[in-house]
Regions:
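Catalytic core of pol beta-like nucleotidyltransferases
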Residues: 1-28, 37-42, 53-104
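Catalytic DNA-binding helix-loop module of base-excision-repair DNA glycosylases/AP lyases
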Residues: 34
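Short, aliphatic-rich beta-strand segments
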Residues: 46-51
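Conserved histidines in hydrophobic membrane contexts and catalytic metal-binding motifs
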Residues: 31
């Protein structure tokens, strides 16, 4: 039976998301921005915060691949942001509104 995860304006098949995250060694994936707040417009992208498992050796090709695969899965352009790369100025607000989509 297919289980769907609904977070704000984003709906995704849980099994597909879990498989994708496992393939890319994702520790946590969270939604933030307009989609998390329920304020998406037809032209909005989806902002996603990612944290990889500590032993992951993710390079730029893998990062771009994850972003593309998430875009395909969600049916929209995805803006993928590394949790470790968050600028101090926005870190608190992003983490406050982040809605967990996946955790390993």
């Amino acid at each position: 039976m297919q289980r769907t995860l609904q977070l704000g304006d984003v709906q995704v098949d849980e099994r597909s998301l879990s498989d994708l995250c496992g393939r890319y060694r994702v520790r946590e994936l969270s939604l933030f921005g307009s989609a998390a707040r329920g304020e998406m417009r037809p032209d909005s992208d989806i902002d996603i915060l990612v944290e990889f498992l500590p032993d992951s050796a993710i390079d730029l090709v893998d990062y771009a691949g994850l972003m593309l695969d998430l875009s395909r899965l969600l049916g929209r352009k995805v803006d993928l942001v590394s949790k470790n790369g968050l600028k101090p100025l926005i870190r608190t607000s992003v983490l406050a509104e982040a809605r967990l989509m996946y955790a390993a």
